[in-house]
């Protein structure tokens, strides 16, 4: 299994280590509950260095990225990032990603850990007709998320840039412990927070500083368990669970990242799919504390209407919650049943997100 540059730090902190997409990663350090609460009330520090970073560089960078993704990359200025998806020719989602516009001739695409090789090959194939160079810099890059309502005031003590001046989905280059870092106001928790991109050799030093300053405000390192709970509470999607190449953006609530005023891979298919959306991703609150697993059947009036895509117990809400891909006939407020081994459990369709935290929504 692959290790991030922070593997030794996780072991030293006593983390429970697990396999995630071929990486050995911390599931939790103390407990998932405590780590979720730290993120919600103070700050959590996450190693997300398993994510992939692919650099696109050259005169046609903006045109190329814009052709590759569904959102309008040409509309954002330098110093901004953008959430988007890449689709295949049939409209299926190849991956969801965040793209940073470094300059007119350089972009960094941050992709899911399980998809690094697939995405890299996909991007290279489509780059052949453009004046760009594509490089996979994942192994030499580290990524740490610093998330929670106290993230700005805490991080400000150790960086040389004004964090208040970094808007939502914006970034600046700065220094932390003398090391160069890209600091973006992005995250996957539903709270205000930052993600710090750096050279892999700088990661351990920076991690130690971040864990120390988090501890000063009752924050703590947080593992993949807390990350998954936080993203589900915020109704953020996970590739491979809530979407994949068998789903299109309209089915999973991502129509807002599809801009039809430009050309891109999969556009023709999506124009047709938009006219006949038969499924949708909904939020469910379940009775009791049992966790609905991916693939569990969802019933409405005894008839199957879909499947669970993600489920977990929410410590923030004190409820079992889930996302499900269901027939478009399902409406908010509907009473459904989820088929567990041995019994059916009642569930209600609620509005997304389950939880709205301190995340900044302004541009």
Curated annotation (Swiss-Prot):
This is Aminomethyltransferase. The glycine cleavage system is composed of four proteins: P, T, L and H. Disulfide bonds: none annotated. The keyword Transferase applies. The lineage of its organism: Bacteria, Thermotogati, Thermotogota, Thermotogae, Thermotogales. Belongs to the GcvT family. Its EC number is 2.1.2.10. One of its GO terms (cellular component) is glycine cleavage complex. It catalyses: N(6)-[(R)-S(8)-aminomethyldihydrolipoyl]-L-lysyl-[protein] + (6S)-5,6,7,8-tetrahydrofolate = N(6)-[(R)-dihydrolipoyl]-L-lysyl-[protein] + (6R)-5,10-methylene-5,6,7,8-tetrahydrofolate + NH4(+). GO terms for molecular function: aminomethyltransferase activity; transaminase activity. The glycine cleavage system catalyzes the degradation of glycine. One of its GO terms (biological process) is glycine decarboxylation via glycine cleavage system. Pfam families: GCV_T, GCV_T_C. Keywords: Aminotransferase, Transferase.
